[in-house]
Amino acid sequence: MKFGLFFLNFMNSKRSSDQVIEEMLDTAHYVDQLKFDTLAVYENHFSNNGVVGAPLTVAGFLLGMTKNAKVASLNHVITTHHPVRVAEEACLLDQMSEGRFAFGFSDCEKSADMRFFNRPTDSQFQLFSECHKIINDAFTTGYCHPNNDFYSFPKISVNPHAFTEGGPAQFVNATSKEVVEWAAKLGLPLVFRWDDSNAQRKEYAGLYHEVAQAHGVDVSQVRHKLTLLVNQNVDGEAARAEARVYLEEFVRESYSNTDFEQKMGELLSENAIGTYEESTQAARVAIECCGAADLLMSFESMEDKAQQRAVIDVVNANIVKYHS
């Protein structure tokens, strides 16, 4: 198993955008000296639940300030971007970092974002699929020549061509059954989301294997990723209380049609939150539910930076001890 960090970069009344970004950069610099494999950046628009609307831009900065870790977009929303521009930027990052960039992408999860960016909501998945085909063609061949309902233009060279043979490593967020089925047919790794339940993760993992098998796709070497929030404290209730404050605005906005206490309880129990024993057991169960090969963690809900570093150090020591 490989381990990394992901950054949600939530704002709230105690955290301004400049503070959030500074904390991300500080943490990235610190963990780059440790044994973590990947740093991934979350994309969000028009709310406090993430201040980064351009994860490839942030990835470029992180690649420039780090030497060891891979850097990834966690969920670059390709449905609301022009695919050629996405491919150009991703290949440029791949070239300039000599292969340290990974391309994590997603369909758009918010219909309001689709409308704002003037994208067709009635054919969203078809657009998502066509965007990825253009990007993937650019990654694998250096060229693209689409002729579909959304994009049609002569064959072009997407410059620079990728440094990595076949293009940057790719993974897609498991945002719906439709996306999971699509990914399985292509043998693309999934990202299981931290705010999905274990039951949802297990369902998606089972669906992926079922569809892959039905289409003769060998997924034995596919490395799915799981994202989890981490908040450890010798006082488990203190860890849960702190994480609850961190998540409250997100839950109220993103799950407005769901019972608040039920969803909050699910997040607190099915992420790595509590004492060391409670959090490691929760992580173990989540990994077993989805069969992920890689784990990405966010430590951002921990306000005390000394405590946050101490927990990161413990994880790093376990990586050295058990996974080197």
Swiss-Prot record:
Belongs to the bacterial luciferase oxidoreductase family. CDD domains: Alkanal_monooxygenase. It is an enzyme of class 1 (oxidoreductase). Its EC number is 1.14.14.3. GO terms for biological process: bioluminescence. It comes from Vibrio harveyi. This is Alkanal monooxygenase beta chain. It catalyses: a long-chain fatty aldehyde + FMNH2 + O2 = a long-chain fatty acid + hnu + FMN + H2O + 2 H(+). Heterodimer of an alpha and a beta chain. InterPro entries: Alkanal_monooxygenase (IPR033924), Bact_Lucif_Oxidored (IPR050766), Bacterial_luciferase_CS (IPR018235), Luciferase-like_dom (IPR011251), Luciferase-like_sf (IPR036661), Luciferase_bac/NFP (IPR002103). GO terms for cellular component: cytosol. Keywords: Flavoprotein, FMN, Luminescence, Monooxygenase, Oxidoreductase, Photoprotein. GO terms for molecular function: alkanal monooxygenase (FMN-linked) activity.
